[in-house]
Amino acid sequence: MHQTSMGIKMESHTLVFISILLCLYGADGNIVMTQSPKSMSMSVGERVTLTCKASENVVTYVSWYQQKPEQSPKLLIYGASNRYTGVPDRFTGSGSATDFTLTISSVQAEDLADYHCGQGYSYPYTFGGGTKLEIK
């Protein structure tokens, strides 16, 4: 009896792990969001361009998020190019169909963070693996 319940518990943990992987990396029929580069190191004042490519047409249903260390993700851009309330105008989103960019016109020290794109066109909604932005 004890072995059976342990087996069920381990199996449920495995299913949760697989579900997370499928959300992050896509499964058959899921849209995969691929970000590049994976990381970059920039100096204050430089222009930064991050890219996100969808495995199929997502029209303009793409959002960009910033996640600083030890903080929850913050919405920067929605609908591919709409800046969320309070987001500095140095952040600009563009693109449509499968190719999207997030540009920071003049990077600041406080922009140190991970940046993720996500698509809301087709369920399950999926996200890119992120770009880690470091400041020199």
Curated annotation (Swiss-Prot):
Cellular component terms per the entry's GO annotation: immunoglobulin complex
PROSITE patterns: IG_LIKE
Annotated region (Complementarity-determining-1), positions in chain: 53-63
Signal peptide, first to last residue: 1-29
Region annotated Framework-1, chain positions: 30-52
Disulfide bonds: none
Transmembrane stretches, start-end: none
Region (Framework-2): 64-78
Pfam family, any one: V-set
This protein's name: Ig kappa chain V-V region MOPC 21
Gene source species: Mus musculus (Mouse)
